[in-house]
Design a protein with these regions (language model features):
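Short nucleic-acid-contacting surface segments enriched for D/E, G, S/T with interspersed K/R
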Residues: 91-112
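GIY-YIG-like beta-to-alpha core
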Residues: 81-95
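Short non-domain terminal segments
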Residues: 7, 86, 90, 108-109, ...
Length: 132
């Protein structure tokens, strides 16, 4: 009889904005050392030079929502930032695609990460972005 370990957590790369080396693929799936976009923008806007991003499909048996997505942004210094915010990612991806179409080098892609008051939930903010 085989002792099979049941995995309670998994992260799979659903999309990467560029080809990743094996070491990068392994590192980007480990988000424990990634900074939360919500936390870094809480006290004011942050300007980040994002050079790549990854969409992760997460399965977590311990979570109320067992299957969800996380978005990981990589800056020019190798720092990782993450969020699960779909509205943030929609804004980010729209800007990224425009920059790609215009062939703007990643070294020149600066994003302003900030929070705005929610129109749907009084007293709450949400993280968003714009081109810096």
């Amino acid at each position: 009889m085989t002792n099979t370990k049941v995995r309670t957590f998994s992260a799979k790369i659903a999309y990467a904005s560029r080809e990743l080396a094996i070491e990068e693929r392994i590192k980007v799936k480990d988000t424990r050392d990634a900074e939360s976009l919500e936390k870094i923008s809480r006290d004011g806007a942050q300007i980040l030079n994002i050079v790549a991003y990854v969409v992760l499909d997460i399965h977590n048996e311990m979570s109320e929502d067992k299957d969800y997505r996380q978005y990981v942004l990589l800056d020019k210094d190798g720092n990782k930032y993450m969020t699960g915010s779909e509205p943030f990612f929609n804004s980010f991806e729209d800007i990224w695609e425009e920059l790609e179409d215009a062939e703007v080098p990643v070294e020149q892609r600066f994003f302003k990460i900030y929070q705005r008051p929610s129109k749907n939930y009084a007293g709450r903010n949400f993280v968003t972005c714009s081109l810096a």
